[in-house]
Regions:
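Solvent-exposed, non-transmembrane regions of membrane-associated and secreted proteins
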Residues: 1-170
Length: 170
């Protein structure tokens, strides 16, 4: 049992390190310098041409405004197959956390009236794990209402209006 727990922890750490490295490498200020956690704004640019060399399915980058509270800053992938990134990393290797991905029936350019983004609710609060705080912390919403989706063409700004727990079997 201890080995299994250690393996899960190691997997979580490897996943986070992969995404942090992608952010350090491909998320930049207009002058080309690396973006720090506090630098993110509408002028922040994702180097999608270079990032797509890592995986051509990367369509966007999702990031919450208040990164001190909500540690969500990930690429959003799209393949048209909702199971592809459920349990695999951006390189196609098995990984329990999978990736953040766009619903297969959506257009990958976020032009639909509703775009559905999936991600796991990890116990260590990675991926979409911090979102459960909307349910359990009354003041959390007031401080964490907004997030941005950065695409190659524009930045979409969204306000959260609801939270819903979905059973894993649904």
């Amino acid at each position: 049992a201890l080995f299994k727990i250690a393996q899960i922890y190691k997997d979580y750490q490897e996943s986070e390190q992969t995404f942090e490295k992608l952010e350090e490498t491909y998320v930049v200020n207009p002058d080309g310098s690396s973006v720090t956690e506090d630098d993110w704004n509408d002028d922040t640019r994702i180097q999608f041409d270079a990032l797509k060399k890592e995986n051509p399915d990367i369509m966007a980058w999702l990031r919450f405004d208040n990164f001190d509270d909500v540690h969500i800053s990930y690429p959003v992938l799209y393949s048209g197959d909702d199971s592809k990134y459920l349990r695999s990393d951006i390189y196609g290797n098995y990984h329990i956390a999978g990736c953040i991905f766009l619903e297969g029936l959506n257009n990958p350019d976020f032009s639909d009236y509703h775009s559905i983004i999936y991600g796991h609710n990890m116990r260590n609060t990675t991926m979409f794990g911090d979102l459960k705080r909307y349910k359990n912390d009354e003041g959390f919403y007031e401080k964490n209402q907004f997030f941005n989706v950065y695409t190659a063409d524009k930045v979409y700004r969204y306000q959260i209006f609801s939270y819903y727990d979905v059973d894993e079997d649904s």
